[in-house]
A protein has these predicted regions:
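Non-catalytic interaction/Regulatory regions outside core domains
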Residues: 1-135
Length: 135
């Protein structure tokens, strides 16, 4: 099992709200993925491929911003939708990690709910841990 496959399995084991994980290249090819079978929301694969290409281009723009040293290095990007949160993390110059998290509110509230909290510290710790291993 490659370190990228280990990463995907560790993320799925870590949090039951993670519905889908994938590692893709900058051309939109999905190289590895895991899907939670009991997920209520299914993200269409063609949409994920389009998103990978779009996010790859966005990371190029973010890298130009970080070259200015004012903000520092970009770590991850979160796009929030009513049903999911989409997290994108660059693994290296050629691979992106995509994590789709269930965004259904935890409980019905009288005030408007904007979904679930994504524990990026823990997700990034898993990414860093797996990246310490050699292929």
């Amino acid at each position: 099992m490659s370190r990228y496959e280990k990463l995907l399995h560790m993320l799925m084991d870590y949090d039951s709200t993670i519905m889908f994980t994938a590692i893709g290249d900058t051309s939109g090819n999905i190289l590895w993925n895991t899907i939670r079978d009991d997920s209520k929301v299914q993200v269409p694969l063609p949409e994920i491929k389009k998103t990978l290409v779009r996010e790859s281009n966005d990371w190029i723009s973010r890298c130009k911003i970080e070259d200015s040293d004012d903000l520092g290095r970009a770590l991850y990007h979160i796009a929030s939708f009513e049903k999911i949160k989409q997290v994108t993390i660059p693994l290296d110059a050629f691979h992106l990690l995509m994590v789709y998290v269930d965004n259904t509110p935890l409980k019905k509230t009288k005030t408007k709910s904007y979904g679930r909290y994504v524990e990026m510290g823990k997700i990034m710790s898993i990414v860093d841990f797996v990246n310490t291993f050699e292929e």
